[in-house]
Amino acid sequence: MGLQEHPVTPAERQPPVRGGVTIGVEEEFLLVDAASGQLAPHAEAVLAEAANGPLGAPDAVLHAEMLNSQVEAATGCCRTLEELRSQLVAARTSLDRAASVAGARIVSSGTPVLAVEGTGTSNGQRFADIAERYRAVASDYHVCGCHVHVGVPDRDTAVAVVNHLRPWLPTLLAISANSPFHLGHDTGHASWRGVQQRLYPGSGVPPHFPSRDAYDREVARLVDCGALVDDRMSFWMARPSPHLPTVELRVADALITAEETVLQAALSRALVRAALDDLAAGREGDEVSDQVAAAAVWNASRYGLRGPAVDPVPARRVPALEMVERLLRRVGPALEQTGDSALVREALAHVTGVGTGSERQRAAAAAGGPREVVAMLAAATAPGRADRLRT
């Protein structure tokens, strides 16, 4: 959700590097009752239980999110995708083990499948301030995302890199789309989280900023205007970390499997590396109007990968899968540099073949109704826990 009370996480605690090497991921999860599949307000109990057991990823951190039916896992600073995957799996397994003690399961979905009842805000003054400022927007914001941090040399570079990322953020959202349901109903959208996020000020594709100072002034202005609670809170899909020299991509829905999260991280890192190469060569990022960028996000939220997309640079509609191919061409050299090309192409072929998370959720609903969706999500979220929800 991006509204954390916690201090800087290991995913953000990355040393200055040449850039585009280190990665870290924050994954948000919903807690559901193991019997009913409804959201379960057990975050405090789950985190306490998880603290008593082996995590299997010493650099990872587990903590609360804004709502008491959510938890988050932040990996440590990783240099390879295999290292990242190992930490993701370990954290998911630890959280699900702890949730089972509380009679719950973790599910990785951008929004809850079933209607929301009996949940509230987690403890903490910042959470209370956010709830008071945004009221129903915050209390109805039962969403989970996946945030990817990529190390860059400094904050000035981070702002410049984000300018180069702007045209590609909607495609990352389409690939990650995993939130078709809201309050027990099919929204008709691939990413309802993407729709709900736009209710907050300072969301969507960030504007182009000519400098770090310009970025900082704009954030300060939004805080002064009351749109943001503080300077850590912007909802833009990509931003410089408020704390350290990283670019944080906050575009993706929470992804069902660890493998899909690794794919999102790999594409994010490759886009940052491509941007760094452009900056080193003196190439400017493509110009994209804010309104066209918003249209591209809307199309990605609505259709995912099975319909039209908007190519923001010529500002025209194209098939969503065509944008995926263009993305692959954009990041191809960067993926070759890190040795990740084959993995990414295979993972993308799998997603386009079996469907995004939203498509798989709808297929499960067609086969067995909403509880079948929750069962599918619970089984796939935590590897090794293939048992279904209790009946």
Curated annotation (Swiss-Prot):
Coiled coil: none annotated. Signal peptide: none annotated. One of its GO terms (molecular function) is glutamate-cysteine ligase activity. Keywords: ATP-binding, Ligase, Nucleotide-binding. GO terms for biological process: modified amino acid biosynthetic process. InterPro entries: GCL_type2/YbdK_subfam, GCS2, Gln_synth/guanido_kin_cat_dom, YbdK. It comes from the Bacteria. Pfam families: GCS2. Its EC number is 6.3.2.2. It catalyses: L-cysteine + L-glutamate + ATP = gamma-L-glutamyl-L-cysteine + ADP + phosphate + H(+). Belongs to the glutamate--cysteine ligase type 2 family. YbdK subfamily. HAMAP family: Glu_cys_ligase_2. ATP-dependent carboxylate-amine ligase which exhibits weak glutamate--cysteine ligase activity. PANTHER family: GLUTAMATE--CYSTEINE LIGASE 2-RELATED. NCBIfam families: gshA_cyan_rel (TIGR02050), PRK13517.1-1 (NF010041). This is Putative glutamate--cysteine ligase 2-2. It comes from Saccharopolyspora erythraea (strain ATCC 11635 / DSM 40517 / JCM 4748 / NBRC 13426 / NCIMB 8594 / NRRL 2338). The lineage of its organism: Bacteria, Bacillati, Actinomycetota, Actinomycetes, Pseudonocardiales.
